[in-house]
Amino acid sequence: MEAHYATVFEKNADAIPNEIALVCGENIRTWKEYDDRAARLATLLTSYGLGSDSKVGLYLHNSNEFLEAQYSVFKVAGVPINVNYRYKEEELIYLLDNSDSEAVFFQGCYAQQIESIKDKLDKVKVFIQVDDGTPQLECAENYEQIISSNEPMERFERSEDNIYMLYTGGTTGMPKGVMYTHGGHLGAMLNTAGAWGMIPIQEKIEIENVSKEVLRISEEESLTVSIPACPLMHGTGMWLGAMIPHLVGGAVVTLPKLGFDPDELLKEVERTKANNIVIVGDAFAKPLMDALDKAESDGNPYNLESVNTVISSG
């Protein structure tokens, strides 16, 4: 079994099909649904000629769709490209052109930005709009219609040498794509999961045994539930808040509201019984502590008994 994110996720979906993989508000997806929806999106990507090492922009907010779209790119052995939704037109053009993106998933609220730059993106073959109540762009495919009108792509063997890439934030110069192999990156994330107690620590965690261990945990204990409070478009949110828990069969809870609302996070921790919270420094930690203190002083403290770890990085 190759050390590739798509392959590990597929094995997890087979092992624990009815366990929860994604939660965003009232929208809940099981591992079976997560895998099926990503496979249908992958069919659309292949119909436009995308495949191994094809780059796909993810111009999205934290959501189930962000993670489904990324999984679909992994399935075709492609390379998801994180797009900062705060970028202006010239920055978007630079990033999507520099990354050689051939497809772009975008949040519906950014339809106007896509409309204004699409003719300058000669390499992009298809735009895919995630519906958020914004009128559908004529030049774009509709996300949910793709899922309803396509069959799941058949699985195939991939390589652990396939590229995974993360673009830097561009705080010192223009954004740059940092490249990893799936095997190297996945191995590091899996070892981190072991260090956090999400999966038993071994001298070397064998990829072949991950889904077996995930099944055992689901039957004998409970699978992890993680909330990335920070954007998935950055490494901290994606790697620590989503990729690691999904490697070990856990659920990822995303907060649909833009900006950080500590009370929204704490209420979601209570509702979903989250075990892990991922934040970025004092910009998150201080408001979080203030909200906890206020709730305590008001006589309505939050129930955080489910929380094992709060991880801050970045």
Put a short name on every predicted segment.
Residues 18-63, 70, 88-93:
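Conserved AMP-binding/adenylate-forming core of the ANL superfamily
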Residues 1-3, 135-162:
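Flexible, low-complexity linker/hinge segments
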Residues 61-81, 85-89, 97-103, 224-225, ...:
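A short helix-loop-beta submotif of the ANL/AMP-binding
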Residues 186-229, 233-278, 291, 295-296:
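Conserved AMP-binding/adenylation subdomain of ANL enzymes
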Residues 30-32, 163-208:
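Conserved AMP-binding A3 loop
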Residues 61, 106-116, 132, 230, ...:
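Adenylate-forming
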Residues 47-48, 75-145:
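Structural core segment of the AMP-binding/adenylate-forming
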Residues 18, 149-169, 173-174, 216-225:
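Conserved pre-ATP/AMP-binding loop-to-beta segment of ANL
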